[in-house]
Design a protein with these regions (language model features):
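Anion-binding alpha/beta catalytic cores of soluble intermediary-metabolism enzymes, centered on
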Residues: 1-345
Length: 345
């Protein structure tokens, strides 16, 4: 099966939202099947209901196991037998449960290596997320990559949630993802300040964390006040930006990427992407949902799979070194951005 296309698992999301619409519309373009082989984790009955109600032409083949997936067609894996009542635009316990069942089955198959990458359909965010999540959420577009140090925290709790250790940990994840997933040889990361005016957290936590990253040969710069940083388009000088909390990263991201965006979970073994929007209940069932973000999430996952393969193969069979590598310091002078140790002098 060396010549088979990349297997892309796609969970159907909340069944009362736009999940099925954007998934099926994404594969109305036959060229998508030239790039990958989709395995939709969901409900054949729910998919059929959405396809007919929204007059979508995409056909799919029902399978019971991921091993049955075939290239050149849209494969729909039945993850549960019970019928799910569809109520467009209304979040219900049944629709949320259906979304969770699809994710649970996809995770099981992930452990069995039955597909290559995972794309999560749009769901309602968990109101009680895992605060100890070691992964890093990265928001991607053609213009910017923004990592979020913390997720779904009230602003008053953010200061207590940040630490030198967490910034170093997430900074390393970001750095490694930029190298392996995006094939950037020596990525530069900007770290944002927590406060509009640099203060205690910046001096005692963020700046020391940046210095520690520098000691580990990671090009980290900052801390930068977020509003001024984006207003001056300083993000264009970096390969990634690490924000301290959701809104600090999401607001400028939405401004810089109004058409579409993709979210990536970095720091986990699997390649996992999702859309930058939720179930969009307000437009569900109207046939006007835009599949661009879902399509871009698939593109990103496929590209990452290829990049990781290209990155990992030489490491598996390395050639003997005939020279001594010297870290390039040119970027420091070329961009003339202040270092953390210089800001608080």
């Amino acid at each position: 099966m060396k010549n088979r296309k990349i297997r892309v698992a796609i969970t159907h999301g909340d069944t009362n939202g736009i999940g099925y619409e954007v998934i099926l519309r994404a594969f109305e373009d036959p060229m998508m099947l030239d790039m990958c082989t989709p395995i939709i984790y969901g409900s054949p009955k729910a998919a059929t209901f959405h396809r007919k109600a929204l007059n979508i032409e995409t056909q799919f083949t029902i399978i019971k196991d991921a091993e049955e997936a075939r290239d050149g067609r849209v494969n729909l894996l039945a993850t549960f037998d019970e019928e799910v009542p569809i109520e467009f635009g209304k979040p219900t316990e049944a629709s949320d449960h259906a979304a969770k069942q699809a994710v649970a089955r996809a995770k099981e198959d992930m452990q069995k290596h039955l597909y290559d990458v995972l794309v999560l359909g749009p769901v309602v965010p968990n109101p009680n997320p895992n605060r100890e999540d070691k992964a890093l959420t990265i928001m991607l577009s053609d213009h910017v990559r923004i990592g979020l140090l913390t997720n779904h925290l009230p602003i008053k709790e953010v200061a207590q949630a940040i630490s030198i250790e967490k910034i170093v940990e997430k900074g390393k994840i970001f750095f490694n993802s930029l190298k392996r997933d995006f094939r950037i040889n020596n990525p530069r990361i900007a770290v944002l300040a927590l406060n509009p005016q640099l203060g205690t957290e910046e001096e005692q936590i963020i700046a020391p964390a940046i210095e520690e990253l520098e000691k580990q040969n990671i090009q980290a710069f900052g801390p930068y006040a977020a509003e001024e940083f984006f207003a001056c388009n300083n993000h264009e000088q970096f390969d990634g930006v690490l924000a301290m909390y959701d809104d600090q990263g999401m607001l400028p991201f939405n401004s810089l990427a109004p058409e579409f965006g993709v979210k990536l979970k970095a720091g986990i073994t699997a390649i996992c992407t999702t859309t930058d929007h939720g179930p969009s209940f307000e437009i569900a069932g109207q046939g006007i949902a835009d599949a661009t973000s879902l399509r871009q999430a698939i593109y990103t996952a496929v590209d990452m799979f290829r990049h990781r393969k290209d990155y990992d193969e030489p490491l598996a069979n390395p050639l003997p070194k005939l020279y001594h590598e010297k870290r390039e310091d040119g970027d420091k002078a070329r961009f003339a951005m202040p270092r953390a140790k210089d800001i608080f002098k």
